[in-house]
């Protein structure tokens, strides 16, 4: 009972602090005053609630009591790095054997593959230059590939579930049941994709990103309660340690926001042009080059590779590289994150294209000749700012392991101290706030920050 009280007090304190923030209260009032924005926010919240309800609808033929909290399967999820991470991303639907168990990860996997193909295969490269029609074709290919990924992942999920908890299968694990359950899982993920598209079109923010974030955030109360339980079962000083953990979590969030928002502004001067009686150009603008241009992708790629040793279970190699708190696991993960940060930044940032666009629009960087020198200048800046960004990203990637090893934080709660969970939450919240702010500023209301602009918005 004391543990529940502590968690309740923590959330009440957070709510009280938000309620006493006059700027936030005023912003919420302004959101309500703008009819279009109000409808979009309510629409988004409604569809997110539908998604959360779907996370508790168990696949027919599976006994939910065999998978509940305290079961062997639930304990196995908490202790397994890969499965635990998938359960976090799905908001617990993975562990519930729900119809939405596979979440949006198959779609994310397909999107990454299509994105990489767009950088290497001429057919997809051409589609990227075809504007809106090309984007629609790419989206269609992504949907088809998502179904392909689901056809592989659905039976694998059912097979793993049967291996872990055979008693949960009411009618056994026949071929017919696997096909039936896989069809439901495919329909569940396609439904999530539909929800995401509707939120993007008629709601606020990016639908798929918000669905991922709400799934992660939904696990926070459960993770916090597990951490409080663990602390109160130890010796005295548990309350102090819990407070220190929450303070540390706040500082980590602030540092991550700084990482996501950090940019290097490159000045660009545009030549004056006279069209008719009007003069254009002659002003100085800036190109914002992000320190963490690759965002969360390097951690996703690195963690995907770190799951390979699990295929060689029972060997010394697997033991050394499969422990989330082990030295070699975290050292290798950090090195991979740094390498993938440079790799992915080089793919998505094209100095040659930026230089050509500037030249085409009559722009130039003061003190730098257009053409090859501009390309080299931008490339040099990106190399310099990517170095600290990659190291910071590597630290974020291994923070959950450090929190578990040196602070004794439970794995479920440690996920919120770094890695993909933290970056996704921060990135999605900032992007959504920027979109809300644009509506407010268009209606001549104050933005979400004292300056009227969110830091890093350009």
Task: Please give the residue ranges for each predicted region.
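N-terminal cationic and glycine-rich segments that engage phosphates or anionic surfaces
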Residues: 1-126, 133-458
């Amino acid at each position: 009972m004391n543990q529940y009280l502590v968690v309740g007090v923590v959330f009440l304190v957070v709510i009280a602090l938000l309620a006493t923030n006059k700027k936030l209260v005023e912003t919420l009032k302004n959101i309500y005053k703008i009819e279009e924005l109000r409808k979009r926010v309510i629409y988004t919240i409604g569809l997110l609630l539908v998604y959360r309800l779907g996370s508790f609808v168990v696949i027919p033929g599976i006994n939910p009591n065999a998978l509940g909290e305290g079961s062997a399967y639930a304990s196995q999820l908490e202790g397994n790095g890969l499965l635990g991470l998938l359960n976090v991303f799905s908001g617990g639907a993975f562990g519930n054997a729900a119809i939405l168990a596979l979440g949006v990860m198959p779609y994310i996997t397909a999107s990454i593959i299509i994105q990489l193909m767009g950088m290497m295969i001429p057919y997809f490269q051409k589609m990227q230059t075809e504007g809106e029609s090309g984007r629609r074709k790419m989206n269609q290919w992504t949907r088809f590939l998502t179904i392909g990924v689901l056809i592989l992942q659905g039976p694998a999920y059912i097979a793993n579930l049967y291996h872990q908890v055979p008693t949960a299968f009411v009618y056994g694990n026949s071929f017919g049941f696997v096909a039936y359950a896989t069809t439901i899982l495919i329909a569940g993920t396609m439904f999530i994709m539909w929800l995401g598209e509707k939120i993007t079109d008629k709601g606020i923010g990016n639908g798929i990103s918000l669905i991922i974030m709400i799934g992660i955030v939904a696990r926070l109360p459960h993770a916090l309660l597990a951490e409080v339980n663990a602390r109160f079962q130890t010796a005295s000083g548990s309350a102090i340690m819990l407070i220190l953990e929450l303070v540390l979590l706040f500082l980590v969030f602030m540092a991550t926001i700084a990482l996501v928002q950090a940019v290097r502004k490159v000045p660009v001067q545009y030549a004056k042009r006279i069209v008719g009686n009007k003069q254009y150009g002659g002003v100085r603008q800036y190109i914002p080059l992000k320190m963490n241009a690759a965002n969360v992708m390097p951690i996703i790629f690195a963690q995907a590779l770190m799951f390979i040793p699990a295929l060689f279970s029972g060997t010394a190699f697997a033991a050394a590289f499969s422990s989330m708190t082990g030295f070699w696991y975290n050292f290798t993960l950090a090195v991979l994150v740094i390498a993938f940060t440079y790799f992915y930044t080089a793919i998505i940032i094209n100095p040659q294209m930026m230089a050509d666009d500037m030249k085409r629009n009559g722009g130039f960087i003061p003190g730098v000749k257009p053409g090859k020198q501009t390309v080299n200048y931008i490339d040099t800046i990106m190399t310099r700012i990517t170095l600290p960004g990659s190291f910071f990203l590597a630290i974020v990637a291994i923070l959950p392991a450090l929190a578990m090893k040196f602070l004794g934080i439970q794995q479920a709660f440690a996920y919120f101290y770094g890695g993909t969970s933290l970056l996704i939450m921060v990135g999605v919240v900032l992007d959504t706030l920027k979109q809300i702010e644009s509506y407010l500023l268009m209606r001549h209301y104050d933005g979400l920050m004292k300056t009227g602009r969110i830091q890093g918005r350009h």
